[in-house]
């Protein structure tokens, strides 16, 4: 039994010595040597498009408040250029193709609304003339106005005075038609202004996308900086 313990002890000692030799045989490598080699950065620099977009928006906001339609169209154009500078290249191309498909439809709708507005405006003018004439005729009959022709006075005939109720109804209808036409024309003006703004935005966006490198050589629209020659 004692010999078995001695033999077991010798085996454990030899195993421990072997593990110690294997551990010492490992070579320690310095951390700086184990790091991968460093290369010069070759990735493109971050795009300056967001900065340009902010500058364009600041330009648009620092102008006047945009009370007129021309100033509102100017702000819409500034916003479209800023959006084009901010978007990704692929998204920019997708928007350009969509705008090219939508613009003819918007222009067609704009032409139809303008024709409709012209018809309503003409109807408004006719109703205004009818309301004015009926008002003058009714007022003259009620006040028994006498007209002088070649030195002789001529009063309004009785049969014409009997038309006052009908003229009053016509005057009321013309006035109501004027109110309806004015409201419709105002609504059409808002729709036309909105469509004009959309057309301006989409055209400005497409113009910004098609801008050549010679016009914007330092900040091209592909999202990367170009070296100045």
From Swiss-Prot:
GO terms for biological process: symbiont-mediated suppression of host innate immune response. It is a multi-pass membrane protein. It comes from the Viruses. Keywords: Host cell membrane, Host Golgi apparatus, Host membrane, Host-virus interaction, Inhibition of host innate immune response by virus, Membrane, Transmembrane, Transmembrane helix, Viral immunoevasion. It holds the Pfam family Orbi_NS3. It is found in: Host cell membrane; Host Golgi apparatus. The chain crosses the membrane at residues 119-139, 162-182. InterPro entries: Orbi_NS3. GO terms for cellular component: host cell Golgi apparatus; host cell plasma membrane; membrane. Belongs to the orbivirus NS3 family. Plays a role in the inhibition of host innate immune response. Interacts with host OPTN and thus inhibits the recruitment of TBK1 to the host Golgi apparatus. In turn, downstream partner IRF3 cannot be activated and IFN-beta production is impaired. Facilitates viral particle release either by increasing plasma membrane permeability through a viroporin-like activity or by viral budding. Forms homooligomers via coiled-coil motif. Interacts with host OPTN; this interaction inhibits innate immune response. This is Non-structural protein P8. It comes from Bluetongue virus 1 (isolate South Africa). The lineage of its organism: Viruses, Riboviria, Orthornavirae, Duplornaviricota, Resentoviricetes.
């Amino acid at each position: 039994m004692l010999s078995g313990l001695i033999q077991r002890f010798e085996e454990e000692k030899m195993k421990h010595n072997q593990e110690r030799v294997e551990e010492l045989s490992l070579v320690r490598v310095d951390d700086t040597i184990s790091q991968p080699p460093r290369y010069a950065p070759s990735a493109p620099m971050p795009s300056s498009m967001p900065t340009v977009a902010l500058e364009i928006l600041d330009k648009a906001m620092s102008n006047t408040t945009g009370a007129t339609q021309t100033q509102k169209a100017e702000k819409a154009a500034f916003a479209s250029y800023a959006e084009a500078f901010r978007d990704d290249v692929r998204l920019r191309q997708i928007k350009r193709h969509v705008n090219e498909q939508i613009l003819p439809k918007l222009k067609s709708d704009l032409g139809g609304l303008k024709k409709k507005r012209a018809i309503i405006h003409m109807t408004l003018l006719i109703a205004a003339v009818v309301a004015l004439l009926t008002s003058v005729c009714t007022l003259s009959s009620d006040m028994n106005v006498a007209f002088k022709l070649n030195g002789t006075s001529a009063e309004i005939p009785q049969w014409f005075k009997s038309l006052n109720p009908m003229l009053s109804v016509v005057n009321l209808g013309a006035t109501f038609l004027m109110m309806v036409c004015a409201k419709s024309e105002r609504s059409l003006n808002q729709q036309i202004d909105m469509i004009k703004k959309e057309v301006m935005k989409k055209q400005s966006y497409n113009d910004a996308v098609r801008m050549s490198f010679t016009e914007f050589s330092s900040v091209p629209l592909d999202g990367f900086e170009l070296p100045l020659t």
